[in-house]
Each structure stands twice: as C-alpha cells, then as structure tokens.
Swiss-Prot record:
It comes from Danio rerio (Zebrafish). GO terms for biological process: cell division; cilium assembly. ATP binds at I10, G11, E12, G13, A14, H15, G16, I17, V18, K33. Belongs to the protein kinase superfamily. CMGC Ser/Thr protein kinase family. CDC2/CDKX subfamily. The gene is cdk20. The keyword Membrane does not apply. SUPFAM superfamilies: Protein kinase-like (PK-like). This is Cyclin-dependent kinase 20.
Length: 344
C-alpha cells in the first residue's frame, strides 16, 4: 500500500471496501478494493477469487473494467482497478429528465459489446445490474464486479447456485431454483436493464423472491409447457402455483419508445433461456441502425458520485485503517495467483 495515496472512500460490498487512490510514482488515479479475510484458516473468499480469475481470463477489453494488479496486504489483499467516476444506477437516478433514445442506444451498445466479449470467453457474469456498470469520466460504460462470475461450458451438465444475481435482474429460471443454467441469465438481466433505461425505473421491482416472480408473470403471463417446455423440470416449479394470467403487451410497459426498441426488448425477456437473443446478435438488431443513432460518448451524462454510493453497504468483517503501514502481509502472494487460477 506504500505506493498509493488514499484520496477517499468510494463504497463497500460483501467482501471488500473500495477506495479512490493515487499511485504516488505515476500519479495515476485508481480504485483499490481491499478484501479482508474473516479468518485466515478460511482462506480467500470464493467471490474474490472468481473476480480475479474472470478478469484474468478476459484480460484487456474496453468494455470491462481493467484489473491492474493484485497484492497481499495485512490479513487480506488488494485488487487494483482502473478508476471509474460513477455507475449507471447513478445516471438513471440523477437524470433530471429521461435519457434520450440515442443515449439509451449508446449505453446498450457498450453493455452488449462487454457482455458479448464475456460470453465469447465462456464467462457468465451472473450479477449484471446498473450499479455494476461503471461510467468513466469520458462517458464510457464498463462491466465491473465479477464476484459471482463463473466459467461455463456448452455441455450443460454443470450445477451452479441459483442464489445469484440481484433480485430485480434475476432470470425466471433462477427464481424457480434452477441449478443448471447458461449465459441466458445474463441476457435476461440485460433485458431488465434495457427496460429500466427506457422507463427510467425498474421493470420488475419485487421485494422478495415470490413477489419478484409475480412481477415477471404479471407482465409476461403465467408460463406453461407450451411457452416454456422445461418449466416442469425446475426444482421449485411445484412449490407454488399461480392463476392463469395473460401477458401484457410490452408496448404498454415501455410506452413512448420505438417499435424497434420494443422488439429487441421482447427478444431478451422470454422464458426459455435458449430463445433469448445473444449479445452479439442483439448488436445487429435494426434498433441500433435506425434514427436516432447511438449518441457519441461525449453526449452522455457524467454524474458525480453522491454522498451515498449506490452499491449495497455491508458491514466489513474487520476494520481497515488505510493510514496504518503494514510492511508484511500474512497472505502469501503466490497463493492469490494459485487459487485464482484454480477457482471455478
């Protein structure tokens, strides 16, 4: 930590506190994510390891936040990221007026390029939401927070946790307890983000898992085997029943938007995961090639971070004093690299 000067605190999450800092020698501004270990014998948290592994796999992409360095510090370690000014949730929340059609197209294009790159590198993010889409001082959007990311294969026989993704952006198969799923969970989240950009408010703001499922069913209609053949195979399918409910036309859910936008939204928000449009296919949709065209990044709003950060605040396991010098770490640097490459 001696090579960095701490400029302030950005926020905190389940496994770390994030600080704005400046590299003393180069003057570069970065974000430092300090991950503390609850107990040394527990080892490095899986979410932190997944974040390191995912970003190592992706390497350098202009639509994914860059991991610059990882080093041990005290009873934990520090991830060094490029510094980003704000996030998309701040853009939505602080907009004095709804985003223009061209601004929405620009954000969606950057998001889809990042998601396409992740999926083409066999990485599911599993927690796409506006707060995890960071915005630079030049208006560029980059995907961040890979703590729930996993490598996937097309064989489809691997089991994953269904307790992933923030509730409002959680795919219906996850709400029904699916343990076998694919990158379609990210594509559902992209659709939810798209709808939120169009409406300036969340599409499915459920307060608990059951209400979340009700929000989805209210719009898309009650699923059956005709529209979703795999639904009866989902673990929680028989645990709760819903009355028959016809779908509401998406034109009524996102009024005052173009037919092309509604058509693309429909292609994300479908029950069968395999039927959701891929990120790469979505980039070729007529929506992006009809007027108004996507805005230049210089035309996008650049919000300042507010006093309260939009990420969920959680109590850190140990207090971390940035001013206290720690010349030796109890975490072996080689273990970070070793575990990161083996974690999946």
């Amino acid at each position: 930590m001696d090579q960095y000067s701490i400029l302030g605190r950005i926020g905190e999450g389940a496994h770390g506190i994030v600080f704005k800092a400046k590299h003393i020698e180069t003057g570069e501004t970065v974000a430092l994510k300090k991950v503390a270990l609850r107990r040394l014998e527990d080892g490095i948290p899986n979410q932190a390891l997944r974040e390191i592994k995912a970003l190592q796999e992706i390497e350098d992409n202009q639509y994914v936040v860059k991991l610059k360095d990882v080093f041990p510090h005290g009873t934990g370690f520090v991830l060094v990221f490029e510094y980003m000014l704000s996030d998309l949730s701040e853009v939505i929340r602080n907009s004095q007026r709804p985003l223009t059609a061209s601004q929405v197209k620009s954000y969606m294009m950057m998001l889809l390029k990042g998601v396409a790159f992740c999926h083409e590198n066999s990485i599911m993010h599993r927690d796409l939401k506006p707060a995890n889409l960071l915005i630079s001082s030049t208006g560029h959007l980059k995907i961040a927070d890979f703590g729930l990311a996993r490598l996937f294969s097309n064989e489809g026989d691997r089991l994953y946790s269904h307790q992933v993704a923030t509730r409002w952006y959680r795919a219906p198969e996850l709400l029904y307890g699916a343990r076998k799923y694919d990158e379609g969970v990210d594509l559902w989240a992209v659709g939810c983000i798209f709808g939120e950009l169009l409406n300036n408010s969340p599409l499915f703001p459920g307060e608990n898992d059951i209400e979340q499922l009700c929000c989805v069913l209210r719009v898309l209609g009650t699923p059956n085997q005709k529209v979703w053949p795999e639904i009866t195979e989902l673990p929680d399918y028989n645990k709760i029943t819903f009355k028959e409910n016809p779908p509401i036309p998406l034109e009524e859910i996102v009024p005052d938007t173009s037919p092309q936008a509604v058509d693309l939204l429909k292609k994300f928000l479908v029950y069968p995961s395999k039927q959701r449009i891929s990120a790469r296919q979505a980039l070729l949709h007529p929506y992006f090639f009809t007027d108004p065209l996507p805005a230049h990044h210089s035309e996008l709003p650049i919000p300042q971070r507010g006093g309260k950060h939009s990420r969920q605040r959680m109590q850190p396991p140990h207090e971390f004093t940035v001013d206290r010098p720690l010349h030796e770490s109890v975490v072996d640097p080689s273990l970070i690299q070793k575990h990161a490459m083996s974690c999946s």
